[in-house]
Amino acid sequence: MSTGQSDCLALVPPDESWAAAVWDYRAEFEAVGDVLAGTADLGAAANFTGWLAGLRADARPDTVRPGRVSADTFLAVRRSDRRLVGMVNIRHALNDYLFRFGGHIGYSVRPTERRKGYAKEMLRLALNKCKGLKLDRVLVTCDSKNEASVRTIRANGGALENRVPEEDGFTDRYWIEVGR
């Protein structure tokens, strides 16, 4: 990170107080035509309240929405100014799709905050959360052409298992030993 500090971010559960910041985050991605990864379908949400209700449902095994797995979504907030710089979605288990393409952790950094080391720190913080979920090994995937994500995953201990073909390219599948 540009500050040289490894503790400049906090992973914060979203609540109503973050509505404007989350919608601004979404708008920044839409303005540049970028994909909102690791946001639990924020791009498809009609409004913040509905998106937040879905997150809360997915956080509990007894209320998770059909076709999904239990997951927690966090806002990556810069401590110095409380700016939302990224989002992380941590899946507690893998279904067939997540095993092949999505992995346990998805994340994104807002376009104006990239190339500052935030993704690396976000993934490190997410891996610490995985310890609390008793996950020993975590699957993290990325588009094989996304060199920044490849570097981020490798910097956090990712070991490439394989490359899976998709319609528009390949997905690289990395395993990270988390330990407990």
Protein language model annotation of sequence segments:
Residues 141, 154, 159-173:
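Conserved catalytic-core motifs of GNAT/GCN5-like acyltransferases
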Residues 130-141:
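Conserved GNAT acetyl-CoA-binding A-motif
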Residues 88, 114, 143:
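Mobile, glycine-rich extracellular loop/lid and propeptide segments
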